[in-house]
Amino acid sequence: MANTSSAKKATRKIARRTAVNKSRRTQMRGSVRIVEEAIASGDRDAALKAMARAEPELMRAAQRNIIHRNAASRKVSRLTHSIAKLAK
């Protein structure tokens, strides 16, 4: 339990930031899920369109320290590789 007023304020700030980050993380995961569903269905055009939306979401999340930048790059790389395999 926070005792000082500054600690109480820090607790409030953390709660607000956590709520914002949770929302952004959910939005990012949703956009990635759409790409994965398009890949699973074999629809290359839909996957490319979804990827065009998902990649900026991932990189924005990395920039805002919601996920690690290497994790974002790895996810983009794996999704791109999966889409490329659809063309073959």
Swiss-Prot record:
One Pfam family name is Ribosomal_S20p
Q: Which GO terms describe its cellular component?
A: cytosol; small ribosomal subunit
Which biological process terms from the Gene Ontology are attached to this UniProt entry?
A: translation
Question: Can you list the disulfide-bonded cysteine pairs?
Answer: none
InterPro entries (UniProt xref)? Ribosomal_bS20, Ribosomal_bS20_sf
Region spans: Disordered: 1-28
* Keyword annotations of the record: Ribonucleoprotein, Ribosomal protein, RNA-binding, rRNA-binding
Task: Identify the domain of life.
Answer: Bacteria
Drop me one GO molecular function for this one. Answer: structural constituent of ribosome
Family classification:
Belongs to the bacterial ribosomal protein bS20 family.
| Function of the protein | Binds directly to 16S ribosomal RNA.
Protein name (record): Small ribosomal subunit protein bS20
What gene name is given for the protein in this entry? rpsT
